[in-house]
Amino acid sequence: MAELLAIKWDDNRDKLILLDQTILPNKIEYIEYDTAEGVYDSIKDMIVRGAPAIGVTAAYGLYFAAKVAPEDNFENFFKYLKEKSSYLDSSRPTAVNLSWALKVMESKALENKDKDVKEIKSILREEAKRIHEEDIEICKAIGENLITLLKDGVGILTHCNAGQLATSKYGTATSPMYLAKEKGWNFKVYSDETRPRLQGSTLTALELYEAGIDVTTITDNMAAMVMSQGKIDAVIVGCDRIAANGDTANKIGTMGVSILAKYFGIPMYIAAPTPSIDMNTKTGKDIPIEERNSEEITSRFGVWTAPKGVKVYNPGFDVTPHENITAIVTEKGIVYPPFKENLKKLFEK
């Protein structure tokens, strides 16, 4: 199978091309976008998912908004741009990369406010492409830092999908796996199924399997058993937002994995692009948690698995306490506790 990429940019046709992740692994189909409204829907409906990929997609979405924005003067242009930025930002509230990418695009427009509006539109196009390319570089650097914490023969547990399908390429949590494969290491990956949307089995297992990596899918409630059997040497997960104290929001179920890892003495590593670290959010209690629709739990595959009308609680994320985290691994380096002090130092470099 050809390499699976979540995001492609058609430079000649000025179109964003996204892999429809809602139908994986059964079908591989790409959808083209050229409007901010289409991009909003792609993020909201999880055609594209994963914090880094969402950020890149949103940047292109704001460029599409800029294309049709008023050109009579900068004030009207920027007012329209800000409105569309807020609109795109509302598509998924937990992933901080979304608002980060939109702010970068807004800042680029402001930096060039004295230029002709048509020229600013072209500048925003190039800025979205730069954010896309930068994400690839960041993911590879995270992998290079993470692999120093691993060794040949390692057993890894991962949760949800912080892989190539959640980023522009390589992934964050999976980046060291691809690099270890290149080195010829003999290692095993256990991929939590990740209820209720099954990103671990439909996405992570798919991309690792296609890459020839030894991957085994387990249900979420098997993680404790696998750890108790000595099969796991490290847990590596991604993140949607990290607070200034190290508390980490990631896909629902990650907190439980961290508790198990701590009990069994297994290191818990967070693979984190620096845009996912929100120093303006003090603790995990300040992170907004998206609640998703009940059908994801009661009738995910068109078959009812619960009584119709039953109450459903479906948070998309939980927050792993910083006390359960061994290290936060970024493209700039590895951050160890105390996170409150050391995350500050990371941004002072």
From Swiss-Prot:
Reactions catalysed: 5-deoxy-alpha-D-ribose 1-phosphate = 5-deoxy-D-ribulose 1-phosphate
Gene3D superfamilies assigned: translation initiation factor eif-2b, domain 1, Translation initiation factor eif-2b, domain 2
GO BP annotations listed: L-methionine salvage from methylthioadenosine; pentose catabolic process
S-S bridge residues: none
Keyword Ligase: no
InterPro entries attached to this UniProt entry: Deoxyribose1P_isomerase_DrdI (IPR043679), IF-2B-related (IPR000649), IF-M1Pi (IPR005251), IF_2B-like_C (IPR042529), Initiation_fac_2B_a/b/d (IPR011559), M1Pi_N (IPR027363), NagB/RpiA_transferase-like (IPR037171)
Site (Transition state stabilizer): C160
Keywords annotated in UniProt: Carbohydrate metabolism, Isomerase
Pathway: Carbohydrate degradation
Enzyme class, UniProt record, top EC level: isomerase
Catalytic site positions: D240
Molecular function GO terms recorded: S-methyl-5-thioribose-1-phosphate isomerase activity
Entry EC number(s): 5.3.1.-
Entry binding sites for substrate: R49, G50, A51, R92, Q199, N250, K251
Pfam families: IF-2B
Function field: Catalyzes the isomerization of 5-deoxy-alpha-D-ribose 1-phosphate to 5-deoxy-D-ribulose 1-phosphate, as part of a 5-deoxyribose salvage pathway that recycles this toxic radical SAM enzyme by-product to mainstream metabolites.
HAMAP family reported in the protein's UniProt record: Deoxyribose1P_isomerase, Salvage_MtnA
Protein family (similarity comment): Belongs to the EIF-2B alpha/beta/delta subunits family. DrdI subfamily.
Name of the protein this chain belongs to: 5-deoxyribose 1-phosphate isomerase
Gene coding for it: drdI
